[in-house]
UniProtKB/Swiss-Prot annotation:
Organism: Staphylococcus saprophyticus subsp. saprophyticus (strain ATCC 15305 / DSM 20229 / NCIMB 8711 / NCTC 7292 / S-41)
UniProt motif HXTX 1: location: 34-37
Disulfide cross-links: none
PANTHER family associated with the record: PHOSPHOESTERASE SAOUHSC_00951-RELATED, PHOSPHOESTERASE YJCG-RELATED
NCBIfam families, per database record: PRK13679.1
Protein name: Putative phosphoesterase SSP1770
Keyword Hydrolase: yes
InterPro entries found in the cross-reference section: 2H_phosphoesterase_YjcG-like, Cyclic_Pdiesterase, YjcG
Length: 169
């Protein structure tokens, strides 16, 4: 079973992000807008209940998370991915570190950059054109996320789905 942990925003913000993703993100149909807290990891099906209990214990005392998407940014030249940057807060970083310090299915592959992906799989020309437009348009969105979502990859439908939500304190 392939799992991951994510913060999923409100439907209103998902709709705003998806307005861009529909046009610019090849993975639009496979996963909802989210901030990755723990990248994908594999477990044996028999370990699922243990994983759920570990998640519950690791989020104890972590409050709801205020997010503020502040601007369009990118991961160039490493990859032509454009995203809405989310201000890194102490609480957001604490939650990320709880699941990426090596005692829960390894460490993160990359430095934590909280964001919502809006465009990927672009040619260099597409990247330049789209990034220029998005940078000018800007974004200033705030909301509080109250749950951490355990997501799984449904291999039959080839998409990520929410398996369970965990309330933050």
């Amino acid at each position: 079973m392939i799992l991951g942990l994510a913060l999923i925003p409100s439907k209103a913000f998902q709709d705003e992000v998806n307005a861009y993703r529909k046009r610019y993100d090849a993975h639009y149909a496979t996963i909802m807008p989210h901030i990755t807290i723990k990248g994908q990891f594999k477990i044996n099906d028999g370990d699922l209940e243990s994983v759920k209990e570990t998640i519950k214990s690791k989020i104890e005392g972590i409050p709801t998370i205020d997010i503020h998407a502040t601007k369009a940014s990118n991961f160039a030249p490493i990859t032509n991915v454009i995203y809405f940057k989310v201000e890194k807060t102490e609480t957001l970083e604490r939650l990320f570190n709880q699941f990426n310090n090596g005692d829960f299915y390894g460490v993160a592959d990359h430095t934590f950059v909280p964001h919502f992906t809006i465009a990927q799989g672009l040619t260099s020309q597409e990247f330049e054109d789209i990034y220029g437009q998005l940078k000018l348009a800007g974004i200033d969105y705030k909301e509080t996320i109250e749950q951490l979502s355990l997501v799984y990859y449904d291999e039959k439908e080839e998409k990520w789905k929410v398996l369970e939500n965990y309330n933050l304190a």
